[in-house]
Design a protein with these regions (language model features):
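Preference for long, amphipathic alpha-helical scaffolds in soluble/luminal domains
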Residues: 2-495
Length: 495
């Protein structure tokens, strides 16, 4: 099939069939841009022109890309405050600004949501409450009193997710008995084994591998008296057994199977064999350090960066180690200055933003030879990934190619961005040299996309055949994104 598609793509002489890129672009889109612009109402034409001008003003014209703000929920600001206290930097001048952002995002009912206009969510609310206490807010403050009422209404502190319990346990606020086990020995499982780290989603790997190091070391961080959460515990019990916090699926269920394993792991913890633990820790450390090369942090995402910082500290890295300092710098790069407030981004989105901006400008009638268009196309071509990443584990014969979402994320090109970039590049008129370069890059991208199709016919975000639902039954899978199955929207864009 690949050969047939390639032969359709190229002429018999091996050169791109479409010498004039606008011919191909017209085949891929309705011919509505400049051809019919004169038929549009004056107000609409003026509105389009203003929108084009506004979009062009936002371009980084020196390099050619667009990168707009990527908004998330307040768990990012809460986790950043937690991290500063983990590092002994709780008096950072950034903490009050982060806290102000969290404070202003509180809902009228006292809680905090995880998406815009959404309802209060228990983990986000507990994290926000804790972060505000770290920042010096009194538990008697009316907003915190209201938050406590909402926490009780949502089921109480024991209903928070695994990662929230994990962070609280680091400060001695939650008993490790109530935190699901994430042993580093998961790194020892070979890739052919049914349960291995490449059967979970790429973003979960970026979170779990560093957490496995932290779980093994379990440092006890002194919690400031002002940040203790005694008032959130209804009794003296500092944890809830996992069986109480997970939905009941009956005695014979995968959930209970994994709960049994969790109990066995906790019983065996600290009893050896110690060489296996040391080996697993070394594998986890090497895995992380390898994926920091050519990337803006582990997975180039906020949770990966935060957990990597804590994992490196647990392994004894000094504050002056260049690898640790680089992760702290990358975390600072995710800051959005809001004056007296500080917001955090989950990651940067330049490749996606540039691709959709090109398509919007071209389809709205901007000259396809416009310098801004050409500059953006060149930047996208420079961001093509030319090394094998984690996807290679389950796609052993696929060619190298594709694009990632962020500025630098060489181990994790994604299918959605690759498809969008290939569409965008067809919307720009380039000179002969750039056209040839584009054809080669798009051909590599096509090969890669075809090789990433899952057995069920669809395409996922980062991996192929990442569909083992059993992983969603693991106790620490409560973030509801444990696997990376094909989806309709990504498959549609690929097609």
């Amino acid at each position: 099939m690949v050969r047939r598609l390639v032969s359709d793509w190229l002429s018999p002489f091996g050169q791109p069939r479409f010498r004039k890129p606008q011919q191909w672009a017209c085949n891929l889109r309705p011919e509505t841009s400049s051809e019919t612009a004169s038929d549009l109402p004056v107000q609409l034409r003026e509105g389009i022109a203003r929108s084009q001008a506004a979009l062009l003003r936002q371009q980084n014209f020196e390099d050619g890309y667009w990168c707009c703000e990527l908004r998330a929920d307040t768990t990012l600001e809460s986790d950043t405050i937690m991290l500063y206290n983990f590092l002994g930097r709780g008096n950072s001048p950034k903490v009050p600004r982060l806290a102000r952002f969290i404070f202003d995002a509180q809902l009228p009912d006292g809680g905090w949501p995880i998406y815009k206009n959404g309802p209060a969510e228990i983990s986000a609310t507990v994290k926000a409450y804790w972060a505000l206490k770290f920042a010096g807010y009194s538990p008697e403050h009316p907003s915190l009193a209201k938050a406590r009422e909402k926490i009780d209404e949502l089921g109480g502190i024991h209903k928070v997710n695994t990662y929230s319990k994990f962070y609280m346990a680091l400060f001695g606020l939650y008993d490790w008995k109530g935190v699901p086990s994430i042993p580093p020995e998961i790194m020892v499982f070979p890739n052919w084994f049914y349960f291995n780290i490449y059967e979970i989603s790429s973003w979960t790997r970026a979170i779990v591998v560093p957490l496995s190091i932290i779980w093994s070391e379990r440092p006890k961080i002194d919690c400031p008296a002002q940040a203790r959460l005694d008032e959130l515990f209804p009794d003296s019990r500092r944890y809830a057994p996992l069986r109480e916090t997970l939905p009941d699926k009956g005695f014979f269920s995968w959930t209970n199977f994994f709960l049994l394993w969790d109990k066995m792991l906790k019983t065996a913890e600290g009893r050896g064999p110690h060489w296996l633990r040391l080996w697993a820790l070394r594998l986890a450390e090497d895995w992380i350090l390898t994926r920091l090369k050519g990337s803006d942090g582990l997975g180039a995402i906020f949770p990966g960066i935060v957990n990597t910082i804590m994992a490196l500290k647990c392994l004894g890295y000094s504050d002056h180690d260049p690898r640790l300092r680089e992760q702290l710098r990358l975390l600072e790069d995710l800051e959005i200055d809001r004056g007296d407030k500080l917001e955090m981004e989950p990651c940067h989105s330049p490749v996606w933003d540039t691709a959709i901006s090109l398509i919007a400008l071209a389809d709205s009638g901007l000259d396809r030879k416009h310098p801004a268009m050409v500059n953006a196309a060149q930047w996208l071509l420079s961001k093509e990934i030319r090394r094998a990443g984690d996807w290679r584990i389950k796609n052993t014969e696929g060619p190298i190619g594709g694009w990632a979402f962020e500025f630098n994320n060489e181990f994790y090109p994604d299918i959605d961005d690759t498809a969008m970039v290939m569409l965008a590049l067809r919307h720009v008129d380039l000179d002969e040299n750039l056209t040839l370069r584009r054809e080669k890059a798009c051909l590599r991208g096509l090969h890669w996309l075809l090789s990433m199709q899952s057995r069920n016919g669809g395409w996922a975000a980062f991996d192929k055949d990442n569909t083992k639902q059993i992983f969603c039954k693991i106790p620490f899978a409560d973030h509801n994104a444990m696997i990376d199955p094909p989806t309709a929207d990504i498959t549609g864009r690929v097609l």
